[in-house]
């Protein structure tokens, strides 16, 4: 008996928990935040697990308390307490006692209707800051000075407050909570008692502590107690001396302020009492509602009891009718016996025939009743089998539809995978095209190098021609040397800029390598863009160097032409001067022969000095040209070394990137193949599991049908045995009747006196046999009905349990398949979005590179024009170039920041839009269908429970 009672308690607690879970579902779905929904789902799962709740009655009660508290908080719309965090592993902790306050809270709709302003003033005061509280207390104390004099009413209100607090502490205890009708008289008794109230601080603290209902460390206990003193010194201070007036007045004001604060506290407690009265009224309403529900249940129970009584009465009426029929049959039999007594002497054979007919009729009625019972039994079994077949057909149709949908989704996914592979092949083709373009650019670079060598050879020839120039080129050579130094500085600065650019590009490439590991397609596009940028920069540098060398060669040629023209002019001038001097000499020879000798000597000395000076200048020019050639050869070798090193670095970086790309492609293909294999394997396993389950169910149904058939055959055998026994008894009775008749004939012939005694004995024996037959037939009927009812109950329970198991398994499989489909859809959508984003980024970067290339072209053209026009403005042009470079850097930084912000926005949109609208709609449809199935099963379970209760009541 104790085990049965424990099982009933477990069933009641489980049913209560199921109701709580069903009531929670709409509120959980209405929660706005996804994290709260996930947390509620984790808590519900934790409560549904037997390992987390415990197996005993206390564990189930604790689980139900958690479920009730969660439902209450969901109805209220705010999660608090333990539900703000995820559930801890292990068993659930026991809820503390103060959590019962949540269950005692009134309905939010009633609370809103009761207070017109939504919240009382004391709640708003508790929420505001302490300074605002002080200001309000000052205002209220200044506006209500007239009410401070009425101290007895305040004392009485405090007495009411203390009494009310005691009543609340008693009413909220678990022992007195059921006696909801006895709350009001206790309150009246407390109001009638008026005891003197002390104004000590300890008394106030004790009352507040007694009013504390499980709330740990409330606000009014954290505040410091206010000292209370009487107002009697007010009158005595007015009669004191003037020396202490100010001091006493300040004390009086302080005491008045203390009294005002205490009066405000009293008002505050009165408002709390009013709210407590409202709360008690709400509690009383809840109790009335519960009592009404109990009365409704009682009325339902009484109606059911009345129905059962009516059925019992009907059955009793049927029994009475059967008894009457039996009495009528007995009367008819008695009449027949009397007739037989009368006609016994005339026709014993006719009497025997009548008895045989009656026995045949009784046996036929019994057989008809048995046949009807068998028909009912078979019909019930057929109905159960039809229901199970219909449900199985429905489940099979749903499973076929789901398999078709999954196959369709798999085909779509395969098509999308093929599209992605095609796009990858297109990207590979583009990469090959870029490699071809790179080879063409390298050829162009070699051609330009050969042209540069030719230009260098021409420059060497020009330098050789310069050796034959005269002393007049000293100034031009100095100018050329200054220009050459400036050009070398420019080249060094450009080389430093190119090296810094190369280092910055290497750092950017390293960062891009890190990003390539995360995203494969983005890394390919970035690599292509970086290669294009490097090639463009390399071309720009080549064109710039070409332009510089051509400009220098042109300048040298122009300077050589100018020098040749100047020398020719000077030679022509010298020739003219010599002619004039010769003419003068011929003229003066006649006049000054003596002076001629002196002039010849002076001329010879002058010639010697000129030759010496020319030789010195020529030697200095040769030394300077040799130094210039050595510097040029050094700069050439350094540039060649730097270009070779740069090319080697580029080749190493390209090889690394190509290896990384190949590895990433191989990993991507392996992951694709692995995922496809896993998907196919899971699909095959699911199909096999479904087929196995269907076969198992068919086998179970066949076994159940075989069991039912065997039971029916056993019942038939039993019925046949009973019928055979009855026929044997009837045959025995017939033989006994024949023997009795023969004995009667003999006795009539032999003994006429003993006829009456023998007749009486025969009638008595016949009645006893008939009564025995009737009792046995009634017992057999009752036993057959009981066995039939038990078998129907067992078959119903088995079918329901099997159907529940099948439904649970199919729901689990549906959830798994839906999860797999959702994951595949998310991966496909993410791949699509990444591909589109990569294409957009590539197009944008190409546009940016083109714009940069055009801007750089324009700037280089302008710089070259300015250099050709004005040599003096070189410094200004260089400063302008520096400013342009700074602007470019700022522009690049802004572009990089914009790209970073754009990538962040794209990833945020990715993360936000992971779940498409179609998937959400499908999930909502599945949730609604599951809800309808759950409601249908609940209704079915309630109907079966009612049938069981009615059957138990009949038994």
Curated annotation (Swiss-Prot):
Entry-linked Pfam families: DUF4485 (PF14846)
UniProt cross-references to InterPro entries, sorted A to Z: CEP112 (IPR055310), DUF4485 (IPR027831)
Protein location: Cytoplasm, Cytoskeleton, Microtubule organizing center, Centrosome
GO cellular component terms attached to this protein's record: centrosome; cytoplasm; inhibitory synapse; plasma membrane
Any GO BP: receptor localization to synapse
Coiled coil: 277-954
Keywords: Coiled coil, Cytoplasm, Cytoskeleton, Disease variant
Organism domain of life: Eukaryota
Connected disease: Spermatogenic failure 44: An autosomal recessive infertility disorder caused by spermatogenesis defects and characterized by the presence of acephalic spermatozoa in the semen of affected individuals.
PANTHER family recorded: CENTROSOMAL PROTEIN OF 112 KDA (PTHR18871:SF2)
Record-given protein name: Centrosomal protein of 112 kDa
Gene: CEP112
């Amino acid at each position: 008996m104790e085990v049965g009672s424990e099982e009933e308690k477990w069933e009641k607690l489980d049913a209560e928990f199921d109701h709580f879970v069903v009531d929670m579902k709409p509120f959980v779905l209405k929660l706005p935040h996804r994290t709260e929904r996930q947390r509620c789902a984790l808590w519900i799962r934790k409560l549904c697990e037997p390992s987390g709740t415990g197996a005993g009655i206390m564990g189930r009660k604790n689980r139900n308390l958690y479920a009730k508290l969660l439902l209450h908080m969901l109805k209220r719309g705010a999660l608090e307490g333990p539900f703000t965090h995820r559930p801890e592993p292990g068993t659930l902790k026991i809820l503390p006692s103060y959590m019962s306050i949540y269950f005692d809270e009134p309905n939010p709709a009633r609370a809103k209707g009761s207070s017109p302003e939504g919240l009382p003033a004391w709640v708003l005061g508790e929420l505001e800051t302490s300074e605002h509280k002080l200001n309000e207390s000052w205002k209220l104390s200044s506006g209500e000075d007239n009410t401070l004099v009425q101290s007895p009413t305040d004392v009485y209100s405090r007495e009411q407050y203390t009494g009310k607090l005691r009543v609340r502490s008693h009413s909220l205890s678990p022992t007195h909570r059921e006696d909801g009708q006895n709350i009001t008289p206790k309150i009246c008794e407390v109001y009638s008692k008026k005891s003197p109230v002390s104004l000590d601080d300890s008394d106030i603290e004790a009352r507040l502590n007694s009013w504390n209902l499980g709330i740990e460390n409330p606000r009014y206990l954290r505040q410091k107690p206010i000292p209370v003193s009487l107002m009697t010194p007010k009158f005595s201070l007015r009669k004191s001396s003037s020396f202490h007036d100010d001091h006493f007045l300040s004390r009086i004001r302080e005491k008045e302020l203390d009294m005002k604060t205490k009066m405000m506290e009293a008002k505050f407690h009165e408002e709390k009492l009013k709210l407590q009265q409202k709360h008690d009224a709400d509690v009383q309403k809840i109790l009335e509602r519960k009592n009404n529900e109990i009365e409704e249940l009682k009325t339902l129970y009484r109606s059911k009891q009345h129905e059962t009584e009516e059925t019992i009465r009907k059955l009793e009426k049927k029994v009475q009718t059967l008894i009457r029929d039996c009495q009528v049959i007995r009367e008819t039999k008695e009449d027949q016996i009397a007739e037989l007594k009368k006609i016994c002497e005339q026709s014993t054979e006719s009497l025997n025939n009548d008895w045989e007919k009656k026995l045949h009729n009784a046996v036929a009625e019994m057989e008809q009743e048995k046949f009807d019972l068998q028909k009912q039994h078979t019909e019930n079994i057929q109905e159960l089998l039809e229901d199970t077949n219909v449900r199985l057909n429905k489940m099979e149709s749903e499973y076929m539809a789901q398999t078709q949908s999954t196959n369709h989704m798999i085909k779509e996914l395969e098509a999308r995978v093929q599209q992605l592979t095609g796009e990858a092949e297109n990207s590979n083709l583009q990469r090959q095209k870029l490699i071809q373009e790179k080879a063409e650019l390298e050829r162009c670079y070699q051609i330009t190098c050969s042209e540069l060598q030719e230009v260098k050879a021409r420059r060497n020839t020009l330098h050789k021609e310069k050796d034959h120039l005269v002393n007049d080129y000293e100034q031009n050579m100095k100018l050329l040397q200054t220009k050459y130094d400036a050009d070398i500085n420019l080249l060094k600065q450009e080389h430093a800029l190119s090296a810094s650019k190369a280092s910055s590009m290497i750092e950017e490439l390293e960062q891009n390598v890190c990003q390539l590991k995360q995203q494969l397609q983005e890394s390919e596009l970035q690599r292509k863009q970086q290669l294009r940028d490097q090639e463009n920069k390399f071309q720009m540098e080549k064109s710039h160097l070409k332009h510089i060398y051509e400009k220098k060669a042109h300048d040298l040629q122009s300077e050589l032409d100018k020098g040749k023209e100047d020398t020719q002019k000077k030679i022509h001038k010298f020739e003219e001067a010599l002619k004039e001097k010769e003419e003068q000499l011929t003229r003066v020879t006649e006049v000054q022969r003596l002076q001629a000798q002196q002039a010849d000597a002076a001329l010879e000395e002058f010639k010697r000095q000129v030759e010496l000076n020319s030789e010195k200048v020529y030697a200095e020019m040769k030394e300077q040209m040799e130094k210039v050639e050595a510097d040029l050869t050094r700069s050439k070798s350094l540039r060649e070394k730097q270009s070779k090193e740069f090319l080697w670095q580029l080749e190493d970086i390209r090889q690394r990137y190509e290896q990384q790309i190949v590895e990433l492609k191989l990993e991507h293909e392996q992951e694709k193949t692995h995922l496809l294999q896993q998907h196919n394997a899971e699909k095959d396993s699911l199909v096999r599991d479904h087929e196995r389950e269907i076969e198992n169910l068919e086998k179970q149904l066949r076994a159940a049908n075989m069991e039912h058939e065997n039971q029916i055959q056993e019942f038939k055998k039993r019925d046949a045995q009973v019928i055979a026994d009855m026929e044997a008894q009837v045959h025995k009775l017939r033989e006994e009747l024949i023997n009795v008749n023969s004995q009667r004939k003999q006795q009539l012939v032999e003994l006429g006196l003993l006829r009456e005694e023998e007749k009486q004995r025969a009638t008595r024996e016949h009645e006893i046999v008939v009564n025995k037959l009737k009792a046995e037939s009634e017992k057999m009927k009752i036993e057959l009905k009981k066995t039939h009812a038990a078998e129907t109950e067992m078959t119903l329970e088995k079918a329901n349990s099997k159907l529940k198991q099948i439904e649970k398994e199919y729901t689990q499989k549906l959830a798994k398949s839906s999860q797999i489909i959702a994951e595949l859809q998310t991966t496909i959508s993410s791949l699509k979005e990444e591909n589109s984003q990569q294409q957009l980024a590539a197009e944008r970067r190409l546009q940016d590179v083109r714009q940069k290339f055009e801007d750089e072209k324009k700037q280089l053209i302008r710089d070259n024009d300015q250099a050709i026009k004005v040599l003096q403005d070189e410094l200004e042009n260089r400063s302008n170039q520096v400013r342009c470079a700074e602007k470019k850097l700022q522009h690049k930084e802004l572009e990089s920041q914009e790209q970073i912000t754009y990538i962040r926005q794209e990833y945020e949109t990715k993360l936000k839009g992971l779940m498409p609208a179609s998937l959400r709609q499908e999930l909502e449809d599945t949730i609604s269908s599951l809800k309808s199935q759950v409601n249908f099963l609940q209704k079915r379970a309630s109907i079966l429970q009612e049938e069981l209760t009615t059957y138990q009541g009949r038994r």
